[in-house]
Amino acid sequence: MIPDISEALSWLEKHPLAVKGIQRGIERETLRVTANGDLATTGHPEILGSALAHPWITTDFAEALLEFITPVDKDVDHLLTFLRDIHRHVSRNLGDERMWPLSMPCFIDSEQNIELAQYGSSNVGRFKTLYREGLKNRYGALMQTISGVHYNFSLPLSFWQAREGVADAESGKKAISAGYFRLIRNYYRFGWVIPYLFGASPAICSSFLRGRETALPFEHTEKGMLYLPYATSLRLSDLGYTNKSQSNLGITFNDLDTYVAALKRAIKTPSEEYAQVGVKKEGRYLQLNTNVLQIENELYAPIRPKRVTRAGETPSDALLRGGIEYIEVRSLDINPFSPTGVSESQVRFLDLFLIWCALADAPEMSADELLCTRKNWNRVILEGRKPGQTVGMRCETIQQPIAEVGKSLFADLRRVAEVLDAENDQPHYQQVCDELLVGFDDPETTFSGRLLTLMKQEGNGSVGLNLAEEYRQMLSGEPLQVLTEEQLVAEGERSWQRQRQIESEDTMGFDDYLATQ
């Protein structure tokens, strides 16, 4: 069963201020597509600013893969309104293009049509594009066009002061990092609840499989859709955004030094497979290096410990310097039922679940047990809505029905919700518990259940196109609420100035720059 956290919940009820001041941020990816759903072949619109230097509007792997990043926010409503304002602004400046509302791409005829994201002529800009060239040559470009939502979350210092007795962030960084690793271990053990409730990629276009072998028993529709009847998130499966070669890196989440050492080892360990790709052929770079990971960001994980980096600092060096500052949840598919790809209910659920993960005991986890937890995730990802589906506890030694585990978890989450709602006029968090709990009695009410029903009727391509057009009209017609047009235009212009400044400050050629990285 789930850990008994009754004592921790009683503690929380006595210390409600410990969770006042949670900080959050959202990153949302979305492909630019044409009116008929084809991948846009135009460059990143200049009017949106520099993809290299804009704080809120950038690109991910491909030139057509937009990424929107909110600032850190303590207010859920303000956070989501800011994100929606970015969407409104972009929607008005895409011409006849629109934003694809699903995680899985559809109308991509050939990987050759996927242009890598471009960041200008500076060394740092060329480095970013070359890293993406490496990803393309290692994993294929199509996999990299899969979109998701990342949720950044940090507990206030008051939580760690009350719970762990730390004085301040600097002197308490060891205890705070240990607390976040406890959260992460619980996330690996129980985070499958996220794709169960919010997975929204139960189907793919047949073009996505072109030339790839799979043992998955797909069912077909006449319109060329492939689906698994009980799947929740094919994006998180081996078909999607994962990397099998990373499963034996031995990265664990028990303490900071061991985690960082394993990560640093991975970026220094040569890979025979990637050595065959080569670094440079006929004067053209193919990847940054031939190691298992080109850089630390290449590590695919459903959750990451993070700290804001300083100039020239790697993510792991930042962690060693100051400890874990926040965590990044990476298991959310694009929510197709929201114009911004994520909803208030999801944000509030994640707050509740991540607080639960921080409160619950989490025994240390070996690399073997980490692989064991993957079995539960895979079961939920591929057939989570199957009647009577179970998850394994204690490395598969006990099997329990998902519905049973989910309801036990939600009994705890409701008590956390009552504490959070005590600060508000409305019982928002408790309402989310009521809304989502239904999904354990009726799996067809989950995102994947609702979406697959729709897709079987209309085809996944049609669903994507119809939603894209609906959201384009909706967003481009809405007034801005927390940002102004002047702010957005000024930020875009400032980003171009910053890019030009970065380009003018380069003092060495790209070959020499690469050698210093």
Curated annotation (Swiss-Prot):
Superkingdom of origin organism: Bacteria
Molecular function, one GO term: ATP binding
Name it: Glutamate--cysteine ligase
Any keyword Nucleotide-binding? yes
Task: Give the enzyme class.
Answer: ligase
Q: Name the SUPFAM superfamilies for this protein.
A: Glutamine synthetase/guanido kinase (SSF55931)
State which pathway it belongs to.
Sulfur metabolism; glutathione biosynthesis; glutathione from L-cysteine and L-glutamate: step 1/2
Keywords associated with the record:
ATP-binding, Glutathione biosynthesis, Ligase, Nucleotide-binding
Gene Ontology biological process terms from the UniProt entry: glutathione biosynthetic process
Protein's UniProt keywords contain Plastid:
no
Q: For this protein, what is the EC number?
A: 6.3.2.2
What chemistry does it catalyse, as a reaction equation? L-cysteine + L-glutamate + ATP = gamma-L-glutamyl-L-cysteine + ADP + phosphate + H(+)
Q: Which residues form a coiled coil?
A: none
UniProt gene name: gshA
**Cellular component terms per the entry's GO annotation:** cytosol
Pfam families assigned to the protein according to its UniProt record, in alphabetical order: Glu_cys_ligase
> Which InterPro entries does this one have?
Gln_synth/guanido_kin_cat_dom, Glu_cys_ligase, Glut_cys_ligase
Protein family membership? Belongs to the glutamate--cysteine ligase type 1 family. Type 1 subfamily.
Q: Which organism is it from?
A: Pectobacterium atrosepticum (strain SCRI 1043 / ATCC BAA-672) (Erwinia carotovora subsp. atroseptica)
